[in-house]
């Protein structure tokens, strides 16, 4: 198993994402693991490159996954203190 590339800190989710995951009985952990291990899901190449830079230089990391028919973003802050799961329209 690939080791995490960075610490994700405290994990929080918006009410909308929390409800969506709960309704579909989907755990967030596999997506958080992918995010921390460098599988950033459905991001364009320029965002993937920005994430690689962010991991090395301490900037914000963004992943994007389709989860049960809805796009969910996972964002880890630059200081690695918090990771948030949210819908793009909640940004």
PLM-predicted stretches and their roles:
Residues 2-61:
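Compact soluble domain cores
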Residues 57-91:
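Short, compact, well-ordered microdomains
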